[in-house]
Amino acid sequence: MPNELSERCSVIEECYEFMLAYAGQGLAGGEGNGQGGLIRDFLSRAAQALGGLESAYASVVKQMGLNPAEPYAAFQEVLARDARDSLVAVELALAQPIISSQLIDNLNASIHLRALLTDLFLIDEIFKGIQHRESPAGAAGSAH
């Protein structure tokens, strides 16, 4: 998967992994352990990554010249909606003065975030498969 899209996906996935660990700590929020600042940092970076996810996907599809174009364009709409919905949920969490483990656990459980993560895993596998087929080693290996 080309760089910008890959980087955005990585930031979002890293945030989700940190959120899982944070949710399991049972923090009421505002503790002096520094985790409150870290969760805000992860969420802020994820929000930035979510904001440009659709355009990064569109760039990859265009750059790779993927055809037929219709399924990729239709999925772009799904990805845009899921990214937008996830961004709203992340921004709502960031707007809270205290971010507890329970709040993050509920954010983790959000169907919006789960749908987005599934979208990311799906496009990652699709683009990996395309790149493998187009690489000289992949093309040679598929001839057997």
Predicted regions and their residues:
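Core of compact, soluble alpha-helical bundle domains
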Residues: 1-63, 141
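Amphipathic alpha-helical binding modules
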Residues: 86-142
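Short alpha-helix boundary/capping elements
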Residues: 20, 47-54, 83-84, 114-121, ...
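General "foldedness" signal
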Residues: 26, 30-33, 60, 67, ...
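Amphipathic protein-protein interaction modules
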Residues: 58-108
